Each structure stands twice: as C-alpha cells, then as structure tokens.
Amino acid sequence: MIALVNFTYLIAMLGFVIGLKFLSSPSRAKNGNHIAAGGMALAVLATLVGLFYGVEISVVKISLIFIAIIAGYLVGKRMSDKVEMTEMPQLISFFNAMGGGCAMLLGIIESRLDDAPSTSNLSLMWAGLIIGAASFSGSIVAYRKLSGKQKDKKAAWIMWLSRILLLVFIAAPLLYVYDLIPQELELITILLSILGLVYGIIFVLPIGGADMPVVISLLNSLTGVATALAGILYDSSIMIAGGIFVGAAGVLLTLLMCQAMNRSLLAVIGGKFKASKGPVGEEEEIEIKTTSFGEVATKLAFANKVAIIPGYGLAVAQAQHLCKQLQSLLESKETEVHYIIHPVAGRMPGHMNVLLAEADVHYDILKEMDAVNDEMSSYDLAIIIGANDVVNPAAETDE
C-alpha cells in the first residue's frame, strides 16, 4: 500500500509540473490549471488512503476529515464564483493567507504532540511556524490594502521593530537548545507564532500599492517555503515538492519584477525610492503640454498602428472595458492595435492579463515590454493609461 501511495504522489507531482508548464502559455493556461488541481486532488486522495490503511483511525476522525475537505471545497468554490475579475488580487491574497495559517497551525499542533523534538525537527517546526504566521498576517494586510481598507504606514519604529523580531527568531531556537530559557515548548511556540503574526503585519504595512504585485508574489513564495518545511518535518514528499514549486516560482517571479522596475527587493520591502540622480541644486523649467479629446481623436483617426500601455491606474479605475471599446473602434477602421504589458502592471502578477481577458481582449495582441522596446518607433501613437511610472525615462536610472 505504501508503494501505491508513493506512486500516486509521483503522478500528482507530474501533474504539478505539467500544470505549471501549461500555465506559461495563454492558450493552455486553463488546461494547466485543471491538471494542477487534479494533481492536488489525487495527492489528497492518496494521503487519505495511506492514512486509513497505515494507522488505526476512528470513523469519527475520518468523517471529520471529509467534512473539512467538503466544507473547504464549497466555501472556496462559492468565493471564486462570486468574486469579480477586478477583485481577483484580493481573493489570491486571502487564499494565500489560508496556506500560511495552515503552516502556522501545523507548527503549534506539532509542539503539542512532541514535547521533546530533536534539534533539527525543532528548527524545521519553528521555521515553518514563523514563516507561515508572517505569510498569514502579511497576506491579510495585503488583502485589506487591495480592498482600500488599509493605508500605507511608514515609520522608523517599524524598521527597528522588524529588526528586533528577526533577532528574536534567530536567538530563540539557540537559547532553547542550550537551556538558556525555560523549556516550555508549547508556550514558546505560541509566543513565536504571535511574534510571527506581528512581523507579517509590519512587513507589509510600509509597502505602497504600486508595489503590491511584488509583495503578493513574495508572500506566495513564503507560503511555499513554509509548506516545504512542514513536508520535511512530516516526511511528506508531496508537501515538499508542492512547496518547492510554489516557493521557487514565487522567488523567481519576485526577482524578475524587481528587475523590471529597476529596484532591489530590499527597496520594495522598505517602501523606499532613492532620490533622482539628476544634478543637485539645478532646476529645469519645462512647459507641460496638454491635449484635448478632439486632438487625441484626430490622431487616432489618422494612426495606422496604436500601442495601448495599461498600468496600475487602469486596474484601479477598472477601465479595461473602455479600452476594449476603443480597440474595437480602431480595428473597425483597420488600425492595428497592441497592448504592451509591463511585468508589474496591475495589482498582482498577471493581473493586467486577467483584466484584459475579462474585457474579451485576445491574447494575440498582448505584447511583453521587452518584445516591443526596440519597435516602439513603428507605432504612430501610444496611449498610456495609468502607467507613467513604467514609461518614465528616469526609471532606467532611478531606483
């Protein structure tokens, strides 16, 4: 039976890999999502079968497990069916918070079951607990920010408190192992989980709305890391593989988005922008050119090739349907229209693609920034919608 369960895990992992591969292609993304979800369902089923045959477990406990699975499915499906496309970032943040919360609870439960863990198990347990707690509370703050219920908060005490908490997270396991603090494992575990929750809150609080795509990606990767650590603790190959997939993909995506913004990850986390590298003390007066609806309409009427560059402002204003109307009008006059997408456009990774897809904009006319940078001179007109930050020439040098 163990061999069958492990073989089923292998099939589930293969489903994860194929699903991730398909997600990189717009035409196969939907199938990729279904394949990955099928792999997860298969992994859950294999775990239940292994649990039923591997240990003596009461019918009541099995029933509770099935009730929890069904309840989670029904709640998740209702939330997904009810949410609007424009609210998808909030939903992703909420679901990610649930993953982090699960990792935190696993650490607390493990401290109750094993009151004398080995040093390695203790390190894994507390690392997963702290990362999961920070991911949970940080994702909740991100959810509130995306919903417009939480404003940015920048203060010197936040930076100092975060540094102190990091020192506590490093020192606590060492002090416990060398008997320099009371050997109350369960109590210390709960205290660390509370401090992890506090760290997650102050981690996200200073970060501005335009940087939320990076934050969401980073929080997703943290949840993946917490899951992988829990998998090592419980000797679960499927948890390890799933956590590594999520963690690695999240880290790579985070770094790519930071590179596209010409900012370091530390600058994003700190909510800081460096000052412009222009000459100090010199001022240049530039006359701002304004335009009118009539002038823009005239330029559009005579343009043969138009670029629409959407950004964070379009996502906030939910103007994707108006863009689609403009696109249809231009295409009726045989004007070629392309949407040029910056890696961090929108409110989460890939959010701009989702918004435009909701407005029935075909993927074929979506172009990535790097693919068209050298061809911008071929466009007769570029319409920038809430994306001044990504087209500003100073973005090439300022951080």
Give residue ranges: language-model regions.
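Transmembrane helix-loop junctions at the membrane interface of multipass transporters and ion channels
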Residues: 55-56, 109-117, 177-187, 209, ...
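Membrane-interfacial segments at transmembrane helix termini in multi-pass membrane proteins
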Residues: 245-303
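Transmembrane alpha-helix boundary signature
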Residues: 47-66, 78-87, 104-119, 143, ...
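Central hydrophobic cores of alpha-helical transmembrane segments in multi-pass inner-membrane proteins
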Residues: 11-21, 40-46, 68-78
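Cytoplasmic-side transmembrane-helix entry/capping segments in multi-pass membrane proteins
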Residues: 30-40, 65-66, 86-99, 152-165, ...
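Structured cytosolic domains appended to multi-pass membrane proteins
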Residues: 284-399
